[in-house]
Amino acid sequence: SAETEKEMANMKEEFEKTKESLAKAEAKRKELEEKMVALMQEKNDLQLQVQAEADSLADAEERQDLIKTKIQLEAKIKEVTERAEDEEEINAELTAKKRKLEDECSELKKDIDDLELTLAKVEKEKHATENKVKNLTEEMAGLDETIAKLTKEKKALQEAHQQTLDDLQAEEDKVNTLTKAKTKLEQQVDDLEGSLEQEKKIRMDLERAKRKLEGDLKLAQETSMDIENDKQQLDEKLKKLEFMTNLQSKIEDEQALMTNLQRIEELEEEIEAERASRAKAEKQRSDLSRELEEISERLEEAGGATSAQIEMNKKREAEFEKMRRDLEEATLQHEATAAALRKKHADSVAELGEQIDNLQRVKQKLEKEKSELKMEIDDLAGNMETVSKAKGNLEKMCRTLEDQLSEVKTKEEEHQRLINELSAQKARLHTESGEFSRQLDEKDAMVSQLSRGGQAFTQQIEGLKRQLEEETKAKSALAHALQSSRRDCDLLREQYEEEQEAKAELQRAMSKANSEVSQWRTKCETDAIQRTEELEEAKKKLAQRLQDAEEHVEAVNSKCASLEKTKQRLQNEAEDLMIDVERSNATCARMDKKQRNFDKVLAEWKHKYEETQAELEASQKESRSLSTEVFKVKNAYEESLDHLETLKRENKNLQQEISDLTEQIAESAKHIHELEKVKKQIDQEKSELQAALEEAEGSLEHEEGKILRIQLELNQVKSEIDRKIAEKDEEIDQLKRNHLRVVESMQSTLDAEIRSRNDALRIKKKMEGDLNEMEIQLNHANRQAAEAIKNLRNTQGILKDTQLHLDDAVRGQDDHKEQLAMVERRANLMQAEIEELRASLEQTERSRRVADQDLLDASERVQLLHTQNTSLINTKKKLETDISQIQGEMEDIVQEARNAEEKAKKAITDAAMMAEELKKEQDTSAHLERMKKNMEQTVKDLQQRLDEAEQLALKGGKKQIQKLEARVKELENEVESEQKRNVEAVKGLRKHERRVKELTYQTEEDRKNVLRLQDLVDKLQSKVKAYKRQAEEAEEQSNINLSKFRKLQHELEEAEERADIAESQVNKLRVKSRDVHSKVISEE
């Protein structure tokens, strides 16, 4: 097209213009090149003259400098070789130590495997005991069901007794005459009941004392049982005096109620005993965990501990079997008593009709019982003697308790003396630590003074160096001038070569442009329409190239102008250099003298610096030794503090025991005082009984006349009895409801107790699982600690290397002083940590020695040692793989620690729930006590009514009285058998309670051990992290020192190369100077 042709024409014109400009530039360039050649020849002549004169001066100076640098470098090379040899020796020692540690690790791993096997056995035994505990809880649930059945039967009996009471209440109006005598007897019965309750309280106190003083408590129990038997005999005699079979039946009912209430109380006590047994169980579990820790430290003792645990488990199994047998016997006894009570109920219903006939026979027995009462009074005197004997026994108990109190006080005084001694040791250690800190401060002050002196020396050396530099400036000015002239020459040569290269590049560009133009022409002719856009781009590129060419031409012109200027400047400088050469010859002689004097001063200052450096090192060693002593003192102080804490705990325990003993003594004194009161009351009762007997004789004669009237009034009473029976039925219904409520509340408390037991068992299983996990974590942590110790030893070797490199850096370079101070601080910190680790290592080595001695004693382990020697090679490979796995295991340990924390939180929430349940149980027990008091009040009301009814019934027939007396005797025998069975059942239940308390205590101790292990794992993790950080810092420092060493080595090699090049140049310049000198002589 036309446009492309125009553009091509324009391009051709521009190309021709550029060709012309290039031709002009080439012509100018040729002229400049010719001028440059002439100038270069002149310059070379001048340089040869200047170099010939200046080289003679520079050669001597360079030789001196090179000799000094060579000596210094040789000394450094020697030091580096010596360090390398020391490092090799250290590496060899470390490899030997590593092998020893690997051997020890393999032995410890095998011991740990043995311990794990024993732990697995112990866990199996624990599971077996837990299953036994579950079986016992099921049996307890069965017993609770039987108790519920017995309560139901008791309600039925109460209903029957209430019916009989309703029948008797019909005759209340007819027995007003005997109320006075009966009220007196009731007062006596109430007093005896109060004494009985006091005796029960005393018995409970004695049972508490039984846990600490079993022998004394047995005697007290025997005396209390004798007193109870005496009281029962007194009750029986008082019942005979009353001559009322209905009263006797009512008393038996009351006794049944009281026994049931006692059973409720005993069940509550059993629940408390089970809680105590749980606490004991947790204690035992904590003891077992402690034994496991001791097993990990002493391998041989672990075997003995496991055998002892197996024996303990066997004993526990035997105890559980005994408890099962006791429970089965108790259930059989309860069933037998239930059947007997049913029979009694049937017999009592049949015999109620015959009671009216028996009442008439009472009159004849009254005269017989008159003589019997006198005998009973004599028996009461005998009982008083037995009470006095019991008092003597209790006084003996008090004496023994006082002796124990005195012993406890002596122990307390000993502990107090120990505490005072420990406090004195603590004060002494404080003073020693203060002295050590003061000595450390003094040493630090010495070090600071020495460092200041060193800084002053370095400042003086720097001042001398400045003087040298100022004096050598004049000397070096000439050398710089010569070097600048040489550099200018080199620059001119380089510029000339660059211009030639630029010319060649322009020619190449021109040829490329021509070829591209021809190509574009051919392409334009063929593809003119299609390639318009490509032509435009090519046009732009050509325009840019033309601009670049123009700029290059301008740059060449500017260089030519600068070359002319440099030519004139060089001519002026050559004239100045000739003058300076003459001056430098004069100053050389002066500088030689000054340099000799300066060398002497330098040698003196170097000697002083070395002395100060030696003093510094000695002070550092002293400070390190002092720091180690301070660390040891701190360890001793911490140990003394731990001992103090243990003594304080023991003191607290002793104080608690003393308080318990004082309470027991006070309670025993109260008991003695109460017994004296009882004695006085019995004397009063004796006199009152005699008076009552006389009144009863008079009243009986008066009542014989009234018996006839009573028979007439009986018919009237029957109608009233029917009316009252309906009222009593309503009261019975109310009592039934109250009893049902009580039974339901008891059942709910028992269900809650069973749930708490199941929860405790679940928690126990969880804690055992957590224990196993924590033991595994401990093993991992021990392995990591061993590896950290190895890394620390490696860091010790690296530390020594870094210390040597730092010393070299201090001598060689002033710039690295600040880095040296930082490194020294780090080194001190590392050394302190290393010393701590050494202390821990020494402790581990002591434990290892103990284990080795135990291993030598054990014949079985000797055979294992032979197999261990063969497996050491395999364990070495395993250790290398374990190192790679440790990081993963650390993450697992962290995760497990978090899981353990969550489990601990759950356990805390469970404990809070248990506390709430305990509060609920306490509330229910308080409610039961209130119910008990209400029941006692109702019983007293019923007794009053019974007494009145009995007074009315005295006017009945004698036959009924005889039958009722026989019935009363049978019931008394049955009651005695029932009481014996109840005592045996109570003993079995108390054993169960103790066992449950022990188990709960073991679970609590296990939870504490788990928390302690978790704290241990956290501490180990923090230590491992600190060791990792220290190792990384040491590696970084070693890498920095290695890089510095490599730089120094590289600089040394470069300096040697420069010295060789300088020597070769000096030789060349000498040859050239000789040639120039010979030419000058020939021209002259």
UniProtKB/Swiss-Prot annotation:
What Pfam families does this protein map onto?
Answer: Myosin_tail_1
Would you say which domain of life the source belongs to? Answer: Eukaryota
Protein keywords? Actin-binding, ATP-binding, Coiled coil, Cytoplasm, Motor protein, Muscle protein, Myosin, Nucleotide-binding, Thick filament
From start to end residue, where is composition biased (Basic and acidic residues)?
Answer: 273-292
Stretches the record annotates as Disordered:
1-20, 270-292, 298-317
Renumbered to this chain, region (Rodlike tail (S2 and LMM domains)) spans: 259-1084
One GO BP = muscle contraction
Record's signal peptide? none
Query: Where does it localize?
Result: Cytoplasm, Myofibril
| Any GO CC annotation of this UniProt entry | myofibril
- Known role: Muscle contraction.
Q: What is known of its domains?
A: The rodlike tail sequence is highly repetitive, showing cycles of a 28-residue repeat pattern composed of 4 heptapeptides, characteristic for alpha-helical coiled coils. Limited proteolysis of myosin heavy chain produces 1 light meromyosin (LMM) and 1 heavy meromyosin (HMM). HMM can be further cleaved into 2 globular subfragments (S1) and 1 rod-shaped subfragment (S2).
Descriptive protein name: Myosin heavy chain, skeletal muscle
Q: Can you name the source organism?
A: Oryctolagus cuniculus
